[in-house]
Amino acid sequence: MVLRYTVIDPTKNITLLVTTPVQRSLQAQTAAWLLRREKEAEQVGFLEESDSAPARLQMMGGEFCGNATMSLGAWLCRKQHLPMGESRDFRLDISGADELVPCSVTAVRGGYIGTVSLPLPLSVEQRSFPTDRGEVTLPVVTFPGICHIVAPTGTVQPYEVEALLRRWSAALPFDAVGLILLDEQRMRIDPLVYVKPTDTAVWERGCGSGSAAAACALTHRRGAAQCLSIKQPGGTIAVTTQWNGSAVTGLTITGTVSLGREKTVDVVF
């Protein structure tokens, strides 16, 4: 199977956008193969046709991904030869989202700046999880198709994070689960995301939905809207939340995107 894909860099969350049509039944296997080939890549999305949007993005685990949404918007802008300094607004069809996702992209020197209006969290709740030292209670932020466990600094040790995430994700009915290590004082996250269909656990250098989850958890705890610049290994993602006194009513992320060249490869399973 000959595939074309583009390597895209949204805040170092290296994303492979496969532009050759791939059957859903083969996407997880194809994504796993590509991730073994592209050592810097952290996730794979598949371009599909949509009746209601310029394009549809199907992520490898069926999850919603803010950075990948931003990446698709930037890819469309390059395809349309958007001049530097100009902007385009899209409503994109993204896996894990029940409605079209608004995405605004501006062409800048060296790439693009994208803002995505994320689906609102379905829930933000405290849940208890087992560790070798007893149970810990942590906020779990659930979005369509993905949930994130937000762990403040010191709650879990770095050496046990991947094992704990795999263990905890078995109790969560999602194909994609993140464990977001949050240093609130430095306003920094270190995100680990486990995707069950591909059995991959990746320390992401930038995570849009993980940044949003941390911001939503803080919004609930602080009881106020937040405007945060959240550092992560690959850079900074800005997150803005709106709050009505009991729930998050608005959620956007903003980050940078750079696009690499298109590649062609013969996939052999």
Regions found by a protein language model. Name each.
Residues 112-120:
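Membrane helix-loop-helix hairpins that form the core translocation module of multi-pass transporters
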Residues 120-139, 158-167:
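Active-site glycine-rich loop that binds ribose-phosphate moieties when present
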Residues 1-112, 142, 147-269:
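A glycine-rich beta-to-alpha transition motif near the start of alpha/beta enzyme domains, typified by
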